[in-house]
Amino acid sequence: MVSVIPLTGLPEVQPGDDLAALLGDAVDRAGGLEDGDVLVVAQKVVSKAEGRVEQTDDLVAAILREARAVRRRRGDLVIAETQHGFVCASAGVDRSNAPREGWIVLLPEDPDASAARIRTGLGERFGRGPAVIVSDSFGRAWRQGTTDVAIGVAGMQPLLDLRGERDARGYELSSTVIAVADELAGAAELVMGKANGVPAAIVRGYAAPPGDGSARELVMPPERDLFP
């Protein structure tokens, strides 16, 4: 059975904080780690710990600076491709949950590396490093609402490739590749939320595909993009 355990009691994260240590304290309060656990951490606390915050009066200028390319724009609404290759609103730049009024939060420079540092820190503390996902909220074309997705991954493969396997009726699967890291991020978001003050959660009971994958594997290759 899969369960999702919120990690509570984390203080307001500041630039330079040892995020792995803060998360480790929260893990202790939640009863520790088990083999196979997946830790999902909200991007905002990762960015704050890494100093990816700044004061600005010009949000659009910050968005354009963080963007590799602008895909669509309508007034102040900008859908942009980030330097990482993610396509999202505002290039991931956000005022919500910023340290103070007039400040913004940027995406981590390398979310995979951020996840790996957390995994290493927890591994040193607990003797086992859980798979780690750094998550952020993305909108989806042609669908209302947002859902959390993985922008950084360590200690697991983000995709589960079922091509070549057979379904319950014996048909061979020809195109089924499941974005398990995104699904785990979405599951964790149910107990984290944007206003609950819970920036991390453990997903327990799911056998994540082992390996050293990257969240960039979740980005659609340009040659397969039908909506460039």
Language-model region placement:
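Electropositive phosphate-/nucleotide-binding environments in soluble metabolic enzymes
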Residues: V13, D17-A21, P108-D112, A116, ...
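A structural signal for small-residue-enriched, beta-sheet-centric alpha/beta enzyme cores
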Residues: S3-L10, Q43-K48, V53-P99, F126-P228
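Intrinsically disordered, low-complexity linker/loop segments enriched in Gly/Pro
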Residues: S90-R117, G121
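N-terminal glycine-/serine-/threonine-rich phosphate-binding loop
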Residues: M1-D37
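Phosphate-interacting basic helix/loop segments used at nucleotide- and nucleic-acid interfaces
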Residues: D17-A30, E109-P130
